[in-house]
Amino acid sequence: MAAAGSSSRFAVTCGLLSQYMRERQQPQPPVTVLEAVAEEEEEEDARTMQLFPPRAAAADGVATPSAGTAPLTIFYDGRMVVVDDVPVEKAAELMRLAGSACSPPQPAHAAALPEMPIARKASLQRFLQKRKHRITTTSEPYKKAAVASPAPEKSFAVAPVKDEPATWLGL
């Protein structure tokens, strides 16, 4: 569970690898991994005596990948890095490292998802309150429905009716 501001170990490792590759290849033209390995072997051979001539002959020829190595392709941050002749052990170690890394950071909109049901509930409550208010206010369709329904009759004991003057006739 990585914090929001930190990045996963895999991202850090890939960042360090890309920084190392940039520093190493900056002053030189692009060199393939096969050429770099051949140069290292030549430097090693120059320091030591060549006691085994077949090895010297193999170093001059094209290097063939051994049975325990294979090319490795890494896709990261929109870039592709291809490394030739990676030992199986190193590839397995990289896979374990990538698998043990934390999940990638979630986008910002994913954090807002738990808040959505609460926001919907509040919106629904406001809507229902407004609807209830509209129903109880004096609007014509609802008044007619309320007037049209007959009121239940009261008991037969009726209070005396007072004759009120018809003030409406004086209009």
From Swiss-Prot:
A motif (Jas) lies at residues 117-142. One of its GO terms (biological process) is response to wounding. Residues 65-100 form the Tify domain. Keywords: Jasmonic acid signaling pathway, Nucleus, Stress response, Transcription, Transcription regulation, Ubl conjugation. It comes from the Eukaryota. One of its GO terms (cellular component) is nucleus. PROSITE patterns: TIFY. Induction: By jasmonate, wounding, and cold, drought and salt stresses. Down-regulated by abscisic acid (ABA). The keyword RNA-binding does not apply. It is found in: Nucleus. InterPro entries: CCT_CS, TIFY/JAZ, Tify_dom. A motif (Nuclear localization signal) lies at residues 119-126. Ubiquitinated. Increase in jasmonoyl isoleucine (JA-Ile) levels mediates its degradation via COI1A-mediated proteasome pathway. Belongs to the TIFY/JAZ family. Interacts with BHLH148 and COI1A. Interacts with COI1A, COI1B and COI2 in a coronatine-dependent manner. Coronatine is an analog of jasmonoyl isoleucine (JA-Ile). Repressor of jasmonate (JA) responses. May act on an initial response of JA-regulated gene expression toward drought tolerance as part of a BHLH148-TIFY11D/JAZ12-COI1A complex. The jas domain (117-142) is required for interaction with COI1. This is Protein TIFY 11d.
